[in-house]
Amino acid sequence: MATKFLFIYLPYISAGIFTLGVLYRFWRWARTPVPLRIVTTPAPRTTVRVILRMVGDVLWFPSLFKGDKFLWLGGFFFHIFLWLVILRHLRFFLYPVPGWVVAMQTLGLYAGYLIPFPLVFLLARRLVMERNLYISILGDFFALFLIMAIAISGILLEVFFRTYVVDVKALILGLVYFQPLVPEISWLFALHFLLVMVLMVYFPFGKLMHAGGLFFSPTRNQRANWEQRFVNPWDFPVGYNPQNLFPPEKYRPAPAESREGKKE
C-alpha cells in the first residue's frame, strides 16, 4: 500500500499542488495594483525593449552580475547545470525520444556530476558571510539541502546503485498517460523520487518561485514612460461625507457681495 501511494497517488498530488500553487502565485501577482512607475533605470521606453530586457534577465542575470560577481558566477552555473539535467530527464517523459534529447544526454550527465559544486558554493556563502547568514531564513537552507539531496541521490543512482532504466521509464510514462503501474524499483530511486515530489510541493510557496516572479516585477516589466499620465483604475468620485467634522465649505471665504450685504 505504501509503494502504491508513493508511486501512484503522491505524484498526482504533488503535481496538482505544484500547478495550482504556481497559478495562484501568478494570479496574486497579476492582480496586485502598481500605481506608480518604479522601473529600474536605465530603462527601455518601448515594449519590445522591455521584452528583450526580461529575456536577458532570465538568460544571464545582468543585474546580479553588476551587484555581486561571485554570486552571479555560482548562480549562473547552477542554473545552467540544472537546465541541462532537466533536459536530460525528458527521455523518461517522451516516447519516442526526440533526437535533440538524445544529443543532450552526455552533456546533461556531466552537468549532473558538476551541479553539487555551485550548490556548495551558495551554501557556504550563506554560512560564512555574516551578513548573508543574518538575513537567511530556514527556507533558504531547506531549499539548498533539498536540491543537494536530489543531486547526490541522482549521482549515486548513476554511478554506484544503478536502476533498470526501462522500469523507471515505464513508471514515468504510466503516470504521464494516466495508466500508472508499480514496477520493481530500488529504495534509492524511491528516495530520489520522493525528494523531487517534496521539491514540487515546496516550489510555489518558497523563494524558488522567483523564477516566475521576475515576469511580474514592476521594476523590470515596465516602460520608462513617466511623462504619460496614469490614472488609477480603482479611482472613483468621492461624495460629501456628512460625518466630516471639517467640511471645506465651512472654511471657504465668503464672496464679496455677501459680505457687503451683511454690512447693510
Task: Give, region by region, the residue ranges found by the protein language model.
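Membrane-interface amphipathic/juxtamembrane segments adjacent to transmembrane helices
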Residues: 26-64, 229
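Long, contiguous internal "core" modules enriched in hydrophobic/ aromatic residues
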Residues: 46, 61-191, 198-226, 232-264
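Long, highly hydrophobic alpha-helical transmembrane signal-anchor segments
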Residues: 1-25, 170-194
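Hydrophobic alpha-helical membrane-embedded segments
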Residues: 9-40, 86-89, 119, 151-155, ...
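Residue-identity detector for threonine
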Residues: 3, 19, 32, 40-41, ...
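Membrane-interface helix-loop-helix junctions at boundaries between adjacent transmembrane segments
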Residues: 1-8, 35-38, 101-105
